[in-house]
Amino acid sequence: RNVALVGHGGSGKTTLLEAALLSTGVISRLGRVEDGNTVSDYDKMEIEKGYSISASVVPVEYKKMKINFIDTPGYFDFVGDVNSALRACESAVILVDAFSGIQVGTEKAWNSCKEYNIPTFFLINKIDKENVDVDKVVTDLQHKFGTSVVMLSEPIEGDVRESLTEAVAESDEELLEKYFGGEEFTDE
């Protein structure tokens, strides 16, 4: 599986990848973009500038599954690398800084994912910052990108389950008929 990490510059794509590498035991110490010691930003210019300039493929094994994460630049001066990465991926994760919310890079990443018809997930990052309102970010994402945006990080029950079911139903005509007919969805 190839998964692109896309989003506005500074949204935390490289840091998320570092956390995945640490969690899976690939690295023993979390690298920091600011310190110039991350796995995916190894180019001299990237280390000097403190941000990704070109896409990097980093394989991660998790539960006997290999995932090739493609860490892409967030600044759209490097959009060619982003588009190349998306063409090689089965899915994409758009990172959104919880404090900053939707930014130009978020919108451009979404548009590129839609252009290549790639299943896309939003990951709201940096939720530990002070004065962050995750519900507002989710609402903003829904207003900007449509009702198919639902929060999955909460237990899938109650209102969240209903929102998820409704969003899935809206994505397919056959599922929509099942939904309005009161039928339960299968796991497929």
List where the protein language model places each region.
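P-loop NTPase catalytic nucleotide-binding module
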Residues: 1-11, 29-30, 98-188
